[in-house]
Amino acid sequence: MEEFQVYLELHKAHNFLYPLFFQEYIYALAHNHRLNRLNRSSLFQNGDYDNKFSSLIVKRLIFRMYQQNNFIISTKNLNQNTFFSHNKNLYYQIISVVLAVIVEIPFSIRFISSLEGKELVKSHNLQSIHSIFPFLEDKFSHLNYVLNVLIPHPIHLEILLQTLRYWIKDASSLHLLRFYLYEYSNLKNFFIPKKSTLNPRFFLFLYNSYVYQYESILFFLRKQSSHLQSNSFGILIERIYFYGKIESLLKVFIKKFQDILWLSKDPFMHYVRYRGKSILASKHGPLLISKWKYYFVNLWQCHFYVWSQSKRVHIKQLSKDYLNFLGYLSSLRLNFLVVRSQMLENSYLIDNVIKKFHTKIPMSSIIASLAKARFCNVLGHPISKSTWTDSSDSEILDRFVRIYRNLAHYYSGSSKKKNLYRIKYILRVSCVKTLARKHKSTVRAFLKRLGSDFLEEFLLEEEQVLSLMFSRVFSVSQRFYRVRIWYLDIFYINDFVNH
């Protein structure tokens, strides 16, 4: 990227992006973006460069786009438009890939400029998905209620454009972006197949920009509520926009309504987001969390013009309900302990309640995914994987082992990992049935001929790794299924369906 830094320098007063659409090096950078993990010199090689990623072709595309008679093409003339019907793949792929690179430039420059003169702390462990769970394990024991939020998608494209308008000041780029989004939204139902090969980076960038704007407003309201509440000369009246200090009401309500003072100020509130879901946890009772639910709904409806459904926001009590987040079912378990305390001749019984963070494997969803991938039926009974019978024995076994390791690796933080026995059983029997089907034999005859030890050598490798980490006081298998372990090298949830 350092080689292109000179070309990517923008004028600070204008931030013009439109001329970059006609620079050839942008297309080389866009097409070879995935090679950033390889040698940087490969960007200048022609081995992986496609001629269709060219500024000349994009010039023709943009010219033909603007030559269309209608800004939004109706359904009547869709079939008559030869440009969109014959060149739809080329149109969407090239424009989306190039837009993804160009619109990120202002954000990258702002990020780099903000880090000038500052030492950037690099911690790869914080990038792991499992790094969230130790935080929840430490914090959730002090919390009571959680607001489980499913972030809604914007219903109008102008909302996305207004979000980008804060960062991109180039009117020509915004106009081209608006034109492309409107054309895509009107044509995708007719021409874009379900299994499209479009570059999702651009649409992911739009969604992240929208979520960033939403979270910025949310955090601003949170800070404003705390700041206004900290003033001793007034009280905060609960309203949508968190404003309305009335000094004259202080003398009337200060004695009778002391509890109002902390309704909007909660130092124990925590916010976590992953993909399209977020959680807002609080230490206080249901009244405060209900108010935050009301604020969420009004924020979406008033600012983003999104009609929020009630099923998108759920209030859960951690001691009673399970929280479905990041593939785990999390909750707080209440352990009641009775302690006898004796002072001189008097003895007392003290009841103590200890909250413990509990994580559970969602077996119903895992079995549903395994059934969808044809490893078992809907009841969890293993079946053969018929589509893999053309592969070699070692390749079939390696696929099943890799699926089990991914699941065991991710769900190693569960409080009770007995359900992993069931997952292992499904995959092992499915593997044996697949191999037996390939060799046109029965399961019993196949196991009798080869023996069952060849499966144990692969599927128990996770336990063999743990044997080097812990002492052999107990058996490794028992320790593996009793100890909760959070790994800090998991950057995404593995999709075992495609393995």
Swiss-Prot record:
InterPro entries, per database record: Domain_X, Maturase_MatK, Maturase_MatK_N
GO molecular function (one): RNA binding
A Pfam family per the record: MatK_N
Keyword field contains Plastid: yes
Main localization (coarse): plastid
Keywords: Chloroplast, mRNA processing, Plastid, RNA-binding, tRNA processing
Signal peptide (UniProt feature, chain positions): none
Cellular component aspect of the GO annotation: chloroplast
Keyword RNA-binding (UniProt): yes
GO biological process, one term: RNA splicing
Localization of this protein: Plastid, Chloroplast
Family, per entry: Belongs to the intron maturase 2 family. MatK subfamily.
Described function: Usually encoded in the trnK tRNA gene intron. Probably assists in splicing its own and other chloroplast group II introns.
Name of protein: Maturase K
Gene: matK
